[in-house]
Amino acid sequence: MEIKCHLHALKDLNLIWPLFLPLFHCVYYLYLRMAERLSITKNGAKLNEAINKTLDDIRAAGTFKEERVITSKQAAEITVQGSDEKVLNFCANNYLGLANSPDLIEAAKEALDSHGFGLASVRFICGTTDMHKELEHLIAKFHGMEDCILYSSCFDANGGFFEALFNAEDAVISDQLNHASIIDGIRLCKAQRYRYNHMDMEDLERILKETQNLRYRCIVTDGVFSMDGDVAPLKEICDLADKYNALVWIDESHSAGFFGKTGRGTPEYCGVQGRIDFIN
């Protein structure tokens, strides 16, 4: 009788255990997820430890940068968080005062009413408006160029330009003191990269001679170098470009609008308007 009961129980168990199989799978899955999460947490802790050590080293070196929070409009005099007094602003690029121009502020308000807030898309899909095209036309006309493309920042423009036009058959020849964004943009492209000594035309000519077998050569320079304020010798650069059949590209971030008799930047200032291939 006892043996029969045990056999009967085993028979019932064989019928029931498949019902618990999904539950077992769920428990096992949760266990694996918890183990994975535990591993991520441990790795995250290691990363935090490494980051904190790096930050401590930066602070110890005296190079840690706190974010400066401005509580007023951009202007020559601004107010910043943590100070009750106005301070002089020497580090913005608001050379012409356009950031706080009453006319531009009013135009921006009108644009909000007519076009709304934000584009809700990238330009390539459906984010280009008639205002973009009008401004691009006016900028191109102002500089005497064929066309213009707007970017959200000069850094983005420098990052996107070189890869779009040049490949391994080409050479980009850059002044060694060009802005970091220019250097990064050149690194992103596949062209062969060369640097000439700062504003050294003999060194530039040496590289132009060495690269004559390549498809395109593009000489790249700041118009006005933002750190030192010196002006690129554009006439000499353009003369060399003509001599060796090279292109000329300049960054006008720190000269357009106020350099030259009519504010058309270093090409006007140096008398080489019409000889520059690309202006950023």
Per-region residue spans from a language model:
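Short, structured coil segments at secondary-structure junctions
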Residues: 168, 188-190, 244, 274-275
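Conserved N-terminal alpha-helix of the aminotransferase class I/II PLP-enzyme fold
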Residues: 106-154
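N-terminal "arm"/small-domain region of PLP-dependent enzymes with the aminotransferase-like
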Residues: 2-36, 43, 47-117, 246, ...
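Conserved active-site segment immediately N-terminal to the catalytic lysine
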Residues: 245, 264-280
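Active-site phosphate-binding strand-loop segment of PLP-dependent enzymes
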Residues: 94, 194, 198-250
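Short, small-residue-enriched loops and turns at beta-alpha junctions
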Residues: 97-98, 125-128, 180, 201-202, ...
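Conserved PLP-anchoring active-site segment centered on the Schiff-base-forming lysine
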Residues: 161-180
